[in-house]
């Protein structure tokens, strides 16, 4: 049996719900829309639907997280590690040649330049500090592309903590370098052989492990999914991305907001971080790219916003790819990091409200965009990030439009995929 907190339908969500409208780093109060109600709802999405054995774990975390992450001590420690260990701020880079191609002013938020090669480290640092302050000694995590697994194994090595990573066997095979990195960092990697053997199954397995070790174990969730308070924790840890975009734009163009924000979305953490400080700013259009796989009219897709219906997955009410009788469908995409049959409840809500425009990007479009960015700017993006780059082709801009696109990770882990599918890259694939 799970706990269903009452859905609250007030829009916009009032700050009176006691969910603290402050960003992790202080600064101005953050939009209502980016934070859930006290019971963890964004509109009708979210909440905490967990088995009874996890009830105490989840409640303890709900009670503990805000006082800890809003404390000066935490903020100071978090900021210092982001700066000195992760290498933040990440650059906001004016992509001149891509700007000329698309007739806009394109800036790339370079999360690929963080330590470990993606945005995932921001959240891993924040959550391990939280776990330590809560007295937990063992860390578990799920991973798809392996980036969150690597980031988690990295911070566990940094703090000398036990680390176990659950990863679908399919992903273990297609992301081999990251598996070896995790092992080198001292993590134990469990290949998951249930279901489709990808990210969703890894999450289920991690939750099972958490059920068996509720006292000493902290589940370090990698995306804005799972039971409340995880979507809010991850969004707050990643909000450093949009916090930096604000001052970096101010420095570069004399105003602190773009006309467009573009990011890829699977569970939704880099997207949440990219839009966090802009959700209530109507001057900013938000465009997210989800994984279309072979196409949204096929059974081989991971486009949850396009193809999902309301349901419960991994402890949250959100949009889910499911059969008519509520069985969760397998998600298909070339990108291990977007291979999730659900979506963070914050994004389900914002998409439903029309605040986010969500485009489905197919495998071939993503591969093409990865080659295009590589040949045009000398930046090899992760296949996940290439989905965001592909969104540029589907939009029309004015020359004055300022567009900020988050390159969520680097493409080293995907070289095999890029080479195997180079025929999808048209003129770029001939080498």
Residues covered by each model-derived region:
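Catalytic phosphate/nucleotide-handling subdomain of diverse soluble enzymes
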Residues: 284-289, 391-431
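Short glycine/serine/threonine-rich phosphate/pyrophosphate-binding segments
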Residues: 117, 121-127, 141-159, 173-176, ...
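Glycine-biased, low-complexity coil/linker segments
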Residues: 16-18
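Active-site nucleophile and cofactor-binding loops and adjacent substrate-binding regions
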Residues: 110-123, 139-149, 195, 238, ...
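Active-site/ligand-binding loops adjacent to catalytic centers
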Residues: 203-229, 233, 255, 280-283, ...
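A short, small-residue-rich loop immediately preceding and capping a beta-strand
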Residues: 115, 131-168, 256-270, 286-289, ...
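Active-site-proximal loop->helix
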Residues: 140, 148-206, 297-308, 417-420
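Positively charged, low-complexity intrinsically disordered leader regions
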Residues: 33-35, 41-46, 63-136
């Amino acid at each position: 049996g799970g706990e269903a907190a009452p859905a609250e339908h007030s829009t916009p969500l009032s700050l009176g719900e006691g969910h603290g409208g402050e960003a992790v780093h202080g600064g101005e109060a953050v939009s209502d829309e980016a934070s859930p109600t006290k019971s963890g709802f964004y509109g009708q999405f979210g909440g905490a639907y967990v088995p009874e054995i996890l009830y105490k774990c989840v409640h303890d975390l709900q009670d503990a997280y805000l006082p800890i992450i809003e404390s000066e001590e935490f903020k100071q420690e978090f900021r210092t590690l982001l700066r000195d260990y992760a290498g933040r701020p990440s650059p906001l880079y004016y992509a001149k040649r891509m700007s000329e191609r698309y007739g806009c002013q394109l800036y790339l938020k370079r999360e690929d330049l963080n330590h470990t090669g993606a945005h995932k480290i921001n959240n891993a640092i924040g959550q391990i500090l939280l776990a330590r302050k809560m007295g937990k000694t063992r860390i578990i995590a799920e991973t798809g592309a392996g980036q969150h697994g690597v980031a988690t194994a990295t911070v566990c090595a940094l703090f000398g903590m036990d680390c176990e990573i659950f990863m679908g066997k399919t992903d273990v095979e297609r992301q081999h370098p990251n598996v070896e990195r995790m092992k080198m960092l001292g993590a134990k990697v469990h290949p998951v052989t249930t279901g489709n053997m990808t990210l969703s199954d890894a999450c289920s397995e991690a939750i099972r492990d958490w059920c068996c070790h509720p006292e000493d174990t902290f589940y370090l969730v990698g995306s804005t999914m799972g039971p409340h308070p995880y979507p809010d924790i991850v969004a707050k840890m990643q909000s450093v991305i949009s916090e930096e975009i604000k001052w970096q734009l101010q420095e570069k163009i004399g105003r602190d907001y773009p006309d467009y924000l573009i990011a890829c979305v699977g569970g939704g953490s880099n997207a949440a971080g990219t839009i966090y400080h802009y959700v209530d700013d109507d001057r900013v259009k938000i465009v997210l790219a989800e994984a279309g796989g072979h196409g949204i009219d096929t059974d081989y897709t991971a486009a949850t916003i396009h193809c999902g219906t309301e349901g419960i997955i991994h402890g949250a009410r959100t949009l889910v790819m499911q059969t008519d009788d509520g069985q969760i469908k397998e998600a298909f995409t070339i990108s291990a990091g977007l291979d999730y049959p659900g979506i963070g409840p914050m994004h389900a809500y914002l998409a439903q409200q029309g605040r986010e425009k969500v485009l489905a990007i197919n495998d071939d479009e993503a591969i093409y965009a990865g080659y295009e960015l590589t040949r045009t700017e000398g930046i090899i993006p992760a296949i996940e990030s290439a989905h965001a780059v592909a969104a540029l082709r589907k939009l029309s801009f004015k020359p004055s439009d300022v567009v900020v696109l988050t390159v969520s990770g680097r493409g080293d882990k995907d070289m095999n995929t890029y080479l195997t599918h180079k025929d999808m890259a048209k003129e770029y694939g001939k080498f």
